[in-house]
């Protein structure tokens, strides 16, 4: 990237983060009465439709504000101080309200009302409050990052306890995965992916507070990367979403579909981990998987990346004779495969830029330009009073009101990727 393009890119992304995305959330998300954050907005951001609080999103907010509080650029000292205050609001709300402490390992409530009182999920009223190990993981990540930002060892100790609980439950298959429930004979790529993130975050925090535990987290980080790449990818670079619990490919489209956004996200997870591990050997396989996901996932008619695709030929996943049609993931796959989602394109932007520049890979840099043009044509909200992205589009890029995971408008992927894009671009200035 030449100097002029670099400076233009930095200016563009600073504007997108600081003048378009963050103002929406800074004006709307804080619950000044109870603590924590609101984010149950409509897809276009025009209305707050519920004051419920999903622990999944509360933990993500905590991570974002904690991370931004540590960024020297593009924020001022006053802004970083405000981010840390907002992070503390979420941290205190979660620590006060979200944990389930009994004779089992530490777990988190999945859903709370605005005061922090636990709520059951519609359709799962008799199944308790701890409905998703993913939600536990986002709380863990938020507390890990907050412990670093605020130099708060108590938050680290809670994050460590939660990390050990998550890993134990994963290894004993004792967990649930709302909003992506799946039968016990299957395992989803998503949790193996998130294990990398959990191990990465607790490693960073333990380096500050607990060097002995950092050695354990370092080992788990490498193990998580190897398991993910060995179990879910093939020699052609295809990364499938679902396998059998004991390993092995699931027949039919249920085992033969991919999520291009997950692959983009996963590959930069692995690269970040590889940097920390000091092991560049993962890069070649990551690039192969990334290129394959982009090839399979791109819509040649309307542009953009599909939500789900056939892992062999790309495009529409076609049903087979023996597909598990009652699996919720299968239903989501078949009904929403062609959706164009905000988070998919933000992940693709960062992944293609990062790998393209670091590997000097023209094909990936061309993909970055293509994804950039598409993303900033269709996702930014044309209503300048809102500006935050329209998050869910139909195949033809028209907005649609629907729920893809939780009934929330989530700032996490856009904000995190804009932060990471800027952080990377700043390194190119040096």
Model-derived features with residue positions:
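Glycan-recognition and catalytic cores of secretory/periplasmic carbohydrate-active enzymes
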Residues: 1-430
């Amino acid at each position: 990237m030449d100097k002029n393009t670099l400076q233009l890119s930095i200016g563009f992304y600073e504007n997108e983060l600081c003048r378009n995305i963050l103002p929406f959330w800074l004006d709307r998300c804080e619950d000044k009465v109870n603590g924590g954050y609101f984010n149950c907005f409509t897809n276009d951001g025009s209305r707050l439709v519920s004051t419920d609080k999903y622990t999944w999103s509360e933990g993500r907010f905590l991570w974002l504000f904690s991370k931004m509080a540590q960024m020297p650029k593009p924020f001022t000292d006053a802004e970083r101080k405000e981010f840390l205050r907002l992070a503390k609001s979420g941290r205190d709300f979660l620590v006060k309200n979200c944990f389930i402490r009994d004779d089992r390992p530490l777990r988190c409530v999945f859903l709370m009302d605005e005061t922090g009182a636990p709520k059951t999920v519609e359709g799962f009223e008799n199944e308790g409050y701890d409905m998703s190990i993913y939600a536990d993981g986002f709380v863990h990540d938020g507390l890990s990052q907050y412990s670093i930002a605020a130099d708060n060892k108590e938050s680290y100790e809670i994050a460590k306890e939660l990390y050990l609980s998550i890993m134990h439950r994963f290894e004993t298959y004792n967990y649930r995965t709302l909003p992506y429930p799946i039968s016990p004979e299957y395992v989803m790529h998503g949790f193996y992916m998130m294990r990398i993130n959990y191990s990465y975050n607790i490693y960073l925090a333990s380096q500050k507070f607990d060097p002995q535990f950092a050695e354990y987290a370092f080992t788990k980080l490498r193990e998580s990367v190897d398991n993910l790449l060995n179990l879910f990818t093939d020699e052609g670079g295809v990364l499938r979403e679902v396998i059998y619990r004991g390993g092995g490919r699931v027949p039919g489209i249920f085992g033969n579909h991919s999520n291009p956004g997950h692959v983009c996200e996963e590959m930069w997870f692995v690269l970040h981990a590889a940097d920390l591990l000091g092991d560049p050997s993962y890069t070649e396989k990551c690039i192969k998987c990334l290129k394959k996901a982009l090839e399979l996932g791109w819509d040649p008619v309307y542009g953009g990346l599909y939500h789900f695709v056939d892992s062999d030929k790309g495009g529409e996943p076609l049903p087979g004779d023996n597909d598990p049609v009652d699996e919720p993931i299968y239903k989501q796959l078949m009904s929403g495969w062609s959706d164009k989602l905000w988070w998919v394109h933000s992940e693709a932007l960062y992944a293609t830029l990062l790998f393209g520049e670091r590997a000097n890979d023209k094909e990936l840099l061309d993909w970055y330009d293509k994804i950039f043009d598409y993303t900033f044509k269709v996702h930014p909200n044309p209503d300048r009073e809102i500006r935050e992205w329209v998050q869910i589009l139909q195949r033809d890029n028209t907005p649609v009101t629907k729920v893809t995971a939780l009934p929330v408008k989530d700032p996490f992927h856009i904000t995190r990727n804009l932060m990471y894009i800027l952080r990377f671009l700043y390194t190119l200035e040096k």
